[in-house]
Amino acid sequence: MSSDPLWGDPLSEAADSVTVPFPGELGDVTAARLAAAGYLGTLALGQPPASAEHRDDILLAVSELAANAIQYAPGPFVLSLRRTFDGIHVVVADTNPDPPEPRRYHPSKGGGIGWHLIQALADEVSVVPGDDGKEIHLFLPW
């Protein structure tokens, strides 16, 4: 039985970062979360999170970013995670150059909380528009 992750190259215990491209299909929300979980699991072997909640917050933020990329920026997206001095830098690059627009939450319509949730979870959030899309950068505690 192979111990290689499902999403690509195996990560070493000393992995400082991981970058994974996705085609932008519905199943990629789960795949992005699994890729992040694999990276964080490997990272935790050498540097455990200060709180178990930090891992869960990062996974939730990755899921929300991936879902937003699929819904609002049709096409491929790239997920990157990198260890920083005191946390994790998450980047999602997608094909839509427009910055996210927060929506009001409507219980009957669903949705509307993802961007607010991302901003609440992260210590810092920035959006970097480009000619071919944008990058959303999050810094979360670890």
Per-region residue spans from a language model:
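Residues at secondary-structure transition points
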Residues: 27, 49, 53-56, 60, ...
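Extended, non-globular alpha-helical segments
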Residues: 17-18, 23-43
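Conserved beta-strand-loop-beta-strand hairpin that lines the nucleotide-binding pocket
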Residues: 1-24, 70-142
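Conserved short strand/loop->alpha-helix "switch" segment adjacent to the catalytic nucleotide/phosphoryl-transfer site
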Residues: 34, 39-63
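Short, well-structured hydrophobic secondary-structure segments
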Residues: 61, 66-71
